[in-house]
Amino acid sequence: EPYRRQRQMCIRDRYEGRAHSILEYTDQAFVLNGFSKRFAMTGLRLGYLIAPKSCMRSLQKLQQNLFICASSVAQQAGIAALRQAEPDVERMKQVYDERRRYMIARLREMGFEIKVEPQGAFYIFADAHKFTTDSYRFAFDVLEHAHVGITPGVDFGTGGEGYVRFSYANSLENIREGLDRISRYLSRPGS
C-alpha cells in the first residue's frame, strides 16, 4: 500500500510461478538487472538498464562518465544467454529450489530461526540469537572450528546483529557436508 501511494512497485525473482516484469504495468519504469545470478555469469560484470525513452540521453551521459564498458567476451556471453539460456535458467531454478528447501529444513533442525524464507537469489538470512549475540564472532568461530564460511548479519547493518547469512550456491553434497560440520560444532560442549 505505501508503494501505491508513491506510485512505486517492486517485483522480484521467485522460485514458483511465472516471472513478472514491471514493464507489464507501465512504460515509465526503470529496470536495473544483471546476468550474474540469472545466467550464472558471476565475474563478467554484465548488467543492463531499461528506462523510459525520455531519460535515456541523461542516463547515457552518466554511464559514459562512470563506467568504461563490459568486455566483448561478457557482451557476447550475454547475447548468447538471452537467446539460448532460458531452459538452463529453469533447470537452475529447480536445482536452487531443492538446495533452498534442504538448507531451510536443516537450519531449522539445528535451531536457527528463519523468519522469512527466501524466494529468489541463493541466500538464507537466519536468526542465530539462540547461539550468539555477536554475529561477527559467531561467523569467525564457525569458520575456525567447522571450516565453513558464513556471513555475519552485522555486515548488513546493525539490524542484522544476531543473524547470519548462508549461501546455497554450491552443490547439494557440499551443502550437506557444510551443514553437518556446523551441526557437529554447535553440539560440542561450550560452543
Where are these regions (language model features)?
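Conserved glycine-rich beta-strand-loop-beta hairpin in the small C-terminal domain of fold type I
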Residues: I79, Q94-I104, K115-A128, G160
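PLP-dependent enzyme catalytic core of the Aspartate aminotransferase-like
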Residues: T132-D134, D141-T151, F156-S191
